[in-house]
Regions:
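Active-site histidine-anchored catalytic micro-motif
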Residues: 1-127
Length: 127
């Protein structure tokens, strides 16, 4: 299994798990954030959120509004999209049989869903 390492860990956000958890906690409580820690249960059904992705120092509290809204979701699948910052490789791509490494642990790519999206969209390439 391929593991994709983070490109900006330690710069856009802390590379240490505990430091990152502390910063996330601060972002939720920040005056520009939701102002509270997310609930653990909700009957609200969320279909998607838009979340800024700059360094936490710039957008962390605002991003926490999105995370707050999905915090109690029981969904088993999240489709995370982002830009191709470097213009290298495919315009729209996903990986299969792989994971993304984060300071909080590995996030496994749902290979079956990625392959279904590739088939359905016709523009998704495998990276």
């Amino acid at each position: 299994m391929e593991i994709r390492t983070p490109a900006v860990s330690g710069t856009f956000y802390p590379g240490d798990e505990n430091e990152l958890k502390d910063l996330i906690h601060e972002c939720f409580l920040h005056e520009l954030g939701p102002g509270k820690i997310p609930p653990t249960d909700s009957d609200q059904k969320i279909y998607g959120v838009i979340c800024p992705h700059a360094g936490f120092v710039y957008s962390g509290p605002v991003a926490c509004h999105s995370f707050y809204s999905i915090s109690s979701s029981t969904s088993k699948l999240a489709i995370i999209t982002g830009p191709n910052h470097y213009g290298i490789g495919q315009n729209v791509a996903s990986m299969v049989d792989s994971s993304w490494k984060t300071p909080l642990g590995l996030v496994e790519v749902d290979s079956e869903s990625a392959l279904e999206l590739r088939e359905d969209l016709g523009i998704l390439e495998l990276d």
